[in-house]
Amino acid sequence: MRLVQHISELPPECRGAVVAIGNFDGVHLGHRAVLNEAAGIARAKGCPLGALVFEPHPREFFQPQAPRFRLTPLPEKARLLGELGIDLLYVERFDAELAARPAQDFVTRILVKGLGVTHIVVGYDFRFGQNREGDVSFLVREGEKAGFGVSVTSAVNTSSSGEPYSSSLIREHLREGRPRRAAELLGHWWRIEGPVLSGDQRGRTIGFPTANIRMDECLEPKHGVYAVRAELVEGPGAGIYDGIANIGLRPTFDKQDVMLEVNLF
């Protein structure tokens, strides 16, 4: 997968894709319906498969002081999208200029002149442009004028509750301490990724060596103790381990930072 961050300067091989558009926070099963639709169209047309995301997340831009809510920071999102077969991941910076851009301008500058899209796929509730003025009906009309196709996927409901798959519902499950319910909606276990911090090493003295990760970018789930599987991706101890994790204030030594502290078996 190729990561593309300068949409206004695309080489020819990065244009003309079938592009799924969204924030895709969590890359959950509802998102996968959009991505699978795009993949099928890309195969039929013989075009590259792309995804267009926005960084920072628009909510982070408009509410910078709000509690952290991200299910998947960009590196994790890119990993998941790559596993789903995305060829081109377009990352458009969300800033004051983009927030103030009319929907018509978004279509002209980004979709047509920037990406040169062949076809786009969005969810039924997709909104864009200044004050969220653009909706899927507007997008379909503009696509007809500009010569690109538009597909709109309907809501995908969960089998258990009948509710639509949504990042908001997954966040609620995690904040209420229901990781298994969250995993059912994600289609995979929720994952926290980050560098292991150098601690005070006192865990070794009581027989429980730990790996500590600061939770700076992602949602803070309900504090408590969880059974986990941990992967160390580099170093002499690289591998996959079972473990027990505490999420919250470091209870052993009365630290005040919110941490993910994993005891590895």
What is the meaning of each model-derived region?
Residues 2-9, 69-72, 90:
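Short acidic-hydrophobic, aromatic-tinged amphipathic segments that line or gate anion-handling sites
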Residues 28, 81, 120, 182, ...:
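Residue-level signal for inorganic ion chemistry
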